[in-house]
């Protein structure tokens, strides 16, 4: 009997020890460092933190190695947010059974778990941009602000990367649908109180009003209604872009989801101080013609793009056209350039009048289509790598040594991927091709 009691005590001791050991393994500290997860504590980590961003990596993956310092830099910033976001990583090559269970088929795969709900992340990977994107993903669709101080705090926390829409005197229900629909593109909030100081600070003179701020371009606009029948959404969509948009590799991607045609002004050097009067005229014209996008581009800044509009050394600049955003553009008869001899706004107004009256000549762009420009951003180095990989694969297949890949992404995942990458800078976008996710 005594032996049995001793045996039971020993079993109880072992059970307690194992329990204590297991629980200590699952103790996580929110100290701004990247957590290293295993197959034994993964589920516990997901349930412990409201928001956790997990990097599923392989030690041999070059992209994974380059991502490590970015995650290390972002982790302490995200940990200090009002709604902290924990960064963690898991060796999916080592814990392959868990990786297969959650369908990890490429490296690195990045997942954001928001209250346990997973969402694959395809956004930028540089630390500063990663922080901006993750803050946006976990924020409420529409923030409800109670006072002037909370309005100021909201604007400061939003930063300068995304446009900010604040409905003063508007009910949350009026913009909740837009906040949900365009969550990845802008910040949305409503303020219950509308003080005189707030009206002066945000430059509107009555409520209700929806104020749009575009910090990146230092632009501001106000919508006083009507707040139904699509008018509100139209204002929001138009306000995603500034009144006049500098055209470059990154901003071309912003035009991808905008169906409006682009009034494109081509100059020699877009930074030259003599162009301020022209930009002022274009901005005034854009105010009155919100059904069009107004953009400008310099030959010096983006020559390969400008060449597509038949611009050469003999072309008189600034040249102005209406581009359909793809393969064609309209040139207004008799008004091909903006001269210094006449008021700029008068010339731009005459150009728009001629365009709307149909006094135009349609031309094909001299080069790749819009999607061609987007695709060209991967760079010639990536093309060489791709050609080399294709050659290797063909050679191996000819030897009968290559099996068909088992991991195939769904069409839905591809669409989500394109949507999230819309505003990703050029040097980031090339890292998201499936062929880039796994390497020797």
UniProtKB/Swiss-Prot annotation:
The keyword Nuclease does not apply. The chain crosses the membrane at residues 376-396. One of its GO terms (cellular component) is membrane. Residues 430-440 have a biased composition (Basic and acidic residues). The active site is at 61 (nucleophile), 64 (nucleophile). Keywords: Disulfide bond, Glycoprotein, Membrane, Phosphoprotein, Redox-active center, Signal, Transmembrane, Transmembrane helix. Residues 406-440 are annotated as: Disordered. GO terms for molecular function: protein disulfide isomerase activity. Disulfide bonds join 61-64. The keyword Nucleus does not apply. Residues 1-23 form the signal peptide. It is found in: Membrane. Coiled coil: none annotated. This is Protein disulfide-isomerase 5-2. The gene is PDIL5-2.
């Amino acid at each position: 009997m005594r032996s049995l009691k001793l045996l039971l005590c020993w079993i109880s001791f072992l059970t307690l020890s194992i329990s204590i050991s297991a629980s200590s393994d699952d103790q996580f500290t929110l100290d701004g460092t990247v957590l290293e997860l295993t197959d034994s504590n993964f589920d516990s980590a997901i349930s412990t933190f409201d928001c956790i961003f997990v990097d599923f990596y392989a030690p041999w993956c070059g992209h994974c190695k380059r991502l490590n310092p970015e995650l290390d830099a972002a982790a302490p910033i995200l940990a200090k947010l009002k709604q902290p976001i924990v960064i963690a990583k898991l060796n999916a090559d080592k814990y392959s059974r868990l990786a297969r269970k959650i369908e990890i088929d490429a490296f690195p795969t990045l997942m954001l778990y928001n209250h346990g709900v997973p969402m694959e992340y395809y956004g930028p990977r540089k630390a500063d941009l990663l922080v901006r994107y993750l803050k946006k993903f976990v924020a409420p669709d529409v923030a409800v602000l109670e006072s002037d101080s909370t309005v100021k705090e909201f604007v400061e926390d939003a930063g300068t990367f995304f446009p900010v829409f604040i409905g003063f005197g508007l009910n949350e229900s009026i913009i909740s649908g837009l906040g949900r629909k365009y969550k990845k593109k802008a910040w949305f909030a409503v303020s219950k109180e509308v003080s005189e100081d707030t009206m002066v600070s945000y430059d509107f003179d009555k409520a209700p009003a929806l104020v749009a701020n575009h910090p990146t371009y230092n632009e501001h606009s106000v919508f006083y209604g009507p707040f139904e029948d699509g008018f509100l959404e139209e204002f929001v969509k138009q306000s995603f872009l500034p009144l006049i948009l500098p055209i470059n590799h990154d901003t071309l991607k912003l035009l991808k989801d905008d169906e409006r045609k682009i009034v494109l002004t081509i100059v020699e050097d877009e930074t030259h101080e003599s162009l301020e009067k022209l930009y002022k005229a274009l901005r005034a014209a854009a105010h009155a013609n919100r059904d069009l996008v107004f953009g400008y581009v310099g030959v010096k800044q983006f020559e390969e793009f400008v060449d597509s509009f038949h611009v050469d050394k003999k072309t008189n600049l600034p040249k102005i056209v209406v581009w359909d955003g793809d393969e064609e553009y309209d040139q207004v008869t008799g008004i091909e350039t903006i001269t210094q001899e006449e008021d700029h706004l008068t010339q731009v107004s005459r150009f728009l009048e001629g365009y709307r009256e149909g006094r135009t000549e349609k031309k094909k762009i001299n080069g790749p289509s819009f999607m061609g420009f987007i695709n060209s951003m991967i760079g010639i180095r990536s093309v060489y790598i791709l050609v080399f990989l294709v050659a290797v694969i063909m050679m191996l297949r000819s030897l009968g040594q290559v099996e068909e890949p088992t991991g195939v992404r769904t069409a839905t995942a591809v669409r989500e991927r394109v949507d999230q990458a819309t505003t990703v800078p050029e040097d980031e976008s090339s890292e998201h091709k499936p062929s880039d996710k796994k390497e020797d």
